Amino acid sequence: WPMIMVVNASGTPAASYEPFFPRLASWGFIVVGNEDGQAGNGETASITLDFMLNIPADSVLSGKIDYDSMGIIGYSQGGAGAICAVTNFENGARYKAMFTGSAAYQTLAKNMGWEYDPAKIKIPYFMAAGTGKSDDSGNDPEKGYGGVSPLSAQIANYNCISDEVQKVRARAVGAEHEQMLMRSDGYMTAWMLYQLTGNEEGESVFLGENAE
């Protein structure tokens, strides 16, 4: 089965949003998380991936994971954590695709100790954020706090990534920062179905004449 690693938002261990996991798993994924509430530097995601790559033979998951079809997703601080997990750790090369919801923008992430370089992203990447004030305050993020994931910073991240990499950016109209897990859920699921399983319906959301 394809596997998805989930990197937590600030102060949000996996147990605090437990229903998210079986819902995503119902689409045919093994969904993995941890209890780290400060996951922005990607370290605990990397440690958790190491554990999953070395599942004990007596585990119920032994022999069940398709290690060639693994994705990673993260929200807010966890968005920065997902990028860091992919780009700053050796085992990050095992991931096939990534999604982030309202990932902390670069300056904010750097100030918080979660520095990342989007130019190092080499796998298909779907980035989403909201248009609400908590994600984009309207202020210049280079001169002050611009919200967690302002449009200008998202565009800058997008442009840093090679055009040879499949990349998608989107904004959820009217969505505030804390709403992005729910507002982006269907699109995130479609992205992972497309990237990890080749699902044609998922692909049609992003490619083709009727793509959204």
Residue ranges and their predicted role:
Residues 34-36, 57-64, 198-209:
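Surface-exposed patches in mature extracellular/periplasmic domains of secreted proteins
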Residues 1-9:
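Short beta-strand element of the alpha/beta-hydrolase
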Residues 1, 43-80, 88-92:
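Gly/Ser-rich "nucleophile elbow"/oxyanion-hole loop immediately N-terminal to the catalytic nucleophile
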Residues 164-165, 173-212:
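Alpha/beta-hydrolase-fold serine-hydrolase catalytic core, especially in secreted/extracellular enzymes
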Residues 93-181:
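The feature captures the conserved acid-bearing segment of alpha/beta-hydrolase catalytic domains
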Residues 81-85, 109:
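Hydrolases whose catalytic domains are alpha/beta-hydrolase-1, hotdog thioesterase
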Residues 19, 84-88:
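Active-site signature of alpha/beta-hydrolase-fold catalytic machinery across serine-
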Residues 15-34:
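Short amphipathic alpha-helix adjacent to the substrate-entry channel of hydrolases
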